[in-house]
Amino acid sequence: MTNIRKTHPLIKIINHSFIDLPAPSNISTWWNFGSLLGLCLAIQILTGLFLAMHYTSDTMTAFSSVTHICRDVNYGWLIRYMHANGASMFFICLFLHVGRGLYYGSYSYFETWNIGVILLFMVMATAFMGYVLPWGQMSFWGATVITNLLSAIPYIGTTLVEWIWGGFSVDKATLTRFFAFHFIXPFIITALVMVHLLFLHETGSNNPSGLISDSDKIPFHPYYTIKDILGVLLLIMALMTLVLFSPDLLGDPDNYTPANPLSTPPHIKPEWYFLFAYAILRSIPNKLGGVLALVFSILILMLFPLLHLAKQRSMMFRPLSQCMFWMLVADLFTLTWIGGQPVEYPFIIIGQLASILYFVIILLILPIVSLIENKLLKW
């Protein structure tokens, strides 16, 4: 009798995706982040579901309901902090996953890559809406500042912002719809993840060398299942260490003050994972210009397949490109730091230089360096 694993219509799909999947024999730990992102998404959906059972999306009671979850609900504090810090772990894994894709040239699978970029946008939008829900000072003012950016769109901007707000300011209608969107979006993300995997399995995984590995494949199970379990254990350990020892490390103290439309916090800033984009937004004195730079700072990822001029796929054997890649990483760290600083000298000029450098490295330096390497290697 043939194994049900290979014949059953549903189990067959799982088998071809996670068990009998041919995988390159040399993929490193950098290939673990896909499964870790899946775990993060599962944790976020589960903890979010339990939070939604006790949360109320009304301006009068939202802040109190979060306090109630932390004080009165059984293990509510644990669920709440796992959800808040789970978002941070999600973004750490996302940035490492994207960085891996850039370093090893995984963007040449452009359907997989483009869906990945759309996923990044979706996760960022979902995280932003989630940050508004506790209805603290930073929730309210963050929502006001970021939604207000849409007013920079010519002609329809103001109407669009008021339409999103559901009134003339961020209020009850805004909070209610943000809760609705924050709830639905992770399920849309899950569907997109399946499409992401579908396209990935059309081509098979890339590997550190960037060479075709069809001649040397191994089954995903047990080799990479056991490897993924190690990653999962490390991720859970890191998350729980954060949650149980310093749950507020990455949060903003201002968000423990209930939202007050009459008092603006001295420094409005988003969560750490948006600071690099926030720094780029702030570094341009023009409102529309800033918004465009903000959008293009992420959208630029879609250009990587077009900007790839090297004859080799991976950066593994391209030391000059490696230098420029790590310079880009250092630049992103600089932008993240600047995004959390007040708008004053010398932070303004550092932010502007780092923002220019970000686009120059991607659009100009990396392609030119690739061409130089082609010449040096006589390709």
UniProtKB/Swiss-Prot annotation:
GO biological process terms held by the UniProt record: mitochondrial electron transport, ubiquinol to cytochrome c
Iron among keywords: yes
Keyword Electron transport part of the UniProt annotation: yes
Alphabetically ordered keywords of this record: Electron transport, Heme, Iron, Membrane, Metal-binding, Mitochondrion, Mitochondrion inner membrane, Respiratory chain, Transmembrane, Transmembrane helix, Transport, Ubiquinone
Cofactors demanded by this protein: heme b
Domain of life: Eukaryota
PROSITE patterns: CYTB_CTER, CYTB_NTER
Record field: transmembrane: 33-53, 77-98, 113-133, 178-198, 226-246, 288-308, 320-340, 347-367
One Gene Ontology molecular-function label: metal ion binding
GO CC, any one term: respiratory chain complex III
Cofactor binding comment, as recorded: Binds 2 heme b groups non-covalently.
Similarity comment text for this entry: Belongs to the cytochrome b family.
Record's subunit section: The cytochrome bc1 complex contains 11 subunits: 3 respiratory subunits (MT-CYB, CYC1 and UQCRFS1), 2 core proteins (UQCRC1 and UQCRC2) and 6 low-molecular weight proteins (UQCRH/QCR6, UQCRB/QCR7, UQCRQ/QCR8, UQCR10/QCR9, UQCR11/QCR10 and a cleavage product of UQCRFS1). This cytochrome bc1 complex then forms a dimer.
Anything else known: Heme 1 (or BL or b562) is low-potential and absorbs at about 562 nm, and heme 2 (or BH or b566) is high-potential and absorbs at about 566 nm.
PANTHER family: CYTOCHROME B
UniProt name for this protein: Cytochrome b
Native species: Callospermophilus saturatus
Gene this protein is translated from: MT-CYB
